[in-house]
Amino acid sequence: TAANVKIFNTEEVQNFINLL
């Protein structure tokens, strides 16, 4: 579960960078 959350967090960060 913790790993899943970490992966989701990373994907969100990438999405944010994409917006920039």
Swiss-Prot record:
EC number: 1.13.11.1
S-S bridge residues: none
rRNA-binding as UniProt keyword: no
Cofactor: how bound: Binds 1 Fe(3+) ion per subunit.
A GO MF label: catechol 1,2-dioxygenase activity
Reaction equations catalysed: catechol + O2 = cis,cis-muconate + 2 H(+)
Keyword field: Aromatic hydrocarbons catabolism, Dioxygenase, Iron, Oxidoreductase
Co-factor(s): Fe(3+)
The protein's annotated pathway: Aromatic compound metabolism; beta-ketoadipate pathway; 5-oxo-4,5-dihydro-2-furylacetate from catechol: step 1/3
Keyword DNA repair: no
GO BP annotations, alphabetical order: beta-ketoadipate pathway
UniProt record similarity statement: Belongs to the intradiol ring-cleavage dioxygenase family.
Subunit structure: Homodimer which dissociates into active monomeric subunits at high ionic strengths.
Protein name: Catechol 1,2-dioxygenase
